[in-house]
Amino acid sequence: MPSAPSTPPSKRKSKFSGFGKFFKPWKWRKRKSSDSFRETQEVLERKISMRKPREELVKRGLIVDVPEEDVSIPSESPPLRNGHMNVKHANLPEDSGGLKRKTRPDSTGHRPKSGETTAQPRSTAEVAPMELHATADVSPMQPQASAEVAPAQPRPASEVGQVQPRPISEVAPMQPRPISEVAPVHPRHVPEKTSEKYRPKSEVAPVRTSRPTSEVAPVQKVSRDFSKQPLLPPKRPLSSSTSVTQESAVGGQKFDPSTRPQSSTPVPTPRTIHPPVSSKQPPVPPPKPQNRNSNPLMAELSLALAGNTLSPAGSRPSPPLPPKRAMPPSTDAVTNKEKALRPASLPPIPANEIAAPSPPSPPVSSRIPAPNPPVPPLTLAPPISEVEKERSASPIPLHIRIQQALNSPQPLPLLDSSQRAQSLLFMQHEVGPSEEGTRVRSLPVTIELLKVPDDDDDEDELSLEDESLSPDSSESHPSRVYIGDVPSVTVIPSYLPTCVQEEDEEEGVSDTDSEGPVLYREEDEDEEEEETSSLANKVKRKDTLAMKLSGRMAPQDSNTELPHRSKDEWNQIRQQIGTQLNRRLSQRPTAEELEQRNILQKNEADRLAEKKEIKRRLTRKLSQRPTVAELLERKILRFNEYVEVTDAHDYDRRADKPWTRLTPADKAAIRKELNEFKSTEMAVHDESKHFTRFHRP
């Protein structure tokens, strides 16, 4: 068999040989700078050049420095500050440096603008406001001359906020007018400077409203004053009232667009110009109307005078708010409300002034009802003498008194005992004459304190009492009783079968009221509800002081009010109360039920005893449990199913472990054990001992 040729086979081209191209070491090659790259570099430098002083830019050749005599040759469109090329305006006489001079503060001193051929030298302060795009604070007497002299400047798109530029065909270039022509601008309409180009067409024409001749100051002096004035940050435009007062002070008369004196110069159609917004400033909110009764004293005064409205000087009537309800409130309710809300010290408003829903006034911080305009007298309004009698007769509820105290500026006079503040809870309802015939006659009764010492359901009783006092339930459930902490006069019918009572009882007692007494409303309170402050509501809810006071007063009142009754009537009433109480007590949940529902807490001793019992049961169970060894023996647990866990102390595993080394005592014990094993290993039965090698004869 011939041996294989020893020459190795020719090397084939590797499958991945092309990868070498990608993994070559990197070589830096110098790139030729392209024209587009150079152009973008110039644009970027021009953008950055906004932050550099002018001489440096001229040195680097980024700005063409046109000499001042070279007025006649305007360059083509100069580049704007943000590097874009400008839209061509044929008639705008500007040089390329002119804009730079506009947008940057002039570092090399003042030079006159190339677009102007005015003989007067313009002071630096006059040019500066235009260059900084700041709105110089023009005092009311100083007309803004320089704003109108300057020709319209194109503003870069970055500075003009969201304003849409108008098409070029609309823009009429403003020819520079000599300063002698410029009429002083009226102080109300001094516009803050924005670029004239982006103003609405109606505003491009300068405002040329003339003042009386006494006001016109010589123009040279004005420009000098303007130059002296320091640059200030722009102030917010004053609100309408202040501007009105200024006008009346300056001109001796109020300038309205309708009543302005005509002058020789043509006046554009009268219009109100909102002061245009400076490009750097955020938009100023429109001035607020001044008669929002922001002065509470003014509001109080106008309330007291009831009709002679005193509003601040520059106030306009405020827009009417939508009425609170779709249906107008009843006139009786309105009169009641007026009666309740009027401070006691003020004279009562005559009946002809008590109007139906008054025109809503603007929201005031302290809700003071605006004085109502006089209206022809209403037929439904009761005569004032009756109203006054009514007021003096019924005690004023406490929450209404608080309302009055909050509303009136003067301290309220102290009332006599009949007018003492009283909670609505204890006001009795009179039954109308129509109902008296149909319904059973009710008897007021003083109930002594019927409170079980271990009573847990006060809430039920309180809710029961509420239902007895609310007007609708007094008709539907005539059998309600008040049982609670406060003894008071309660309405109980003189004779009614108890079965009817019990049916009623089942209908409406709710256990959910845990808030204390919920007070009912009178009919005229519905309208009053919106007006009441939170403090009054709080007092209305929890008027405990009034409850106590009425509780004290009740016994004396009851002596006078209650007629003498026969023994049978008293027994009947007591029987009714007794049946009600029995029924209530029979319905009470037992202590066990309450404990189950976690309402009643158990006694501490009982709780501990229960704990002990549980512990004892558990230990007994544990003691009877089989051990692990037993379970393993009985093959219930396999050896790997139970792992004993012991507590091991943490120790350093690399350190010396002395417990692993055997002490001499350990060794002796081990040896002894081994010897014992050996000695017993060969133990044999006596009968077979002779078979062994080691035996004594």
From Swiss-Prot:
Residue spans of biased composition, Acidic residues class: 454-469, 501-514, 522-532
Keyword annotations of the record: Actin-binding, Cell projection, Cytoplasm, Developmental protein, Neurogenesis, Repeat
InterPro entries found in the cross-reference section: RPEL_repeat (IPR004018)
Basic and acidic residues composition bias: residue spans: 189-202
Keyword Repeat appears in the UniProt entry: yes
Source taxon at top rank: Eukaryota
SMART domains to which the protein is assigned, alphabetical: RPEL
RPEL repeats: 42-67, 579-604, 616-641
Subcellular location: Cytoplasm; Cell projection, Lamellipodium
Pfam families: RPEL
Coiled-coil positions: none
Subunit structure: Binds ppp1ca and actin.
Recorded family membership: Belongs to the phosphatase and actin regulator family.
Name of the featured protein: Phosphatase and actin regulator 4-B
Gene of this entry: phactr4-b
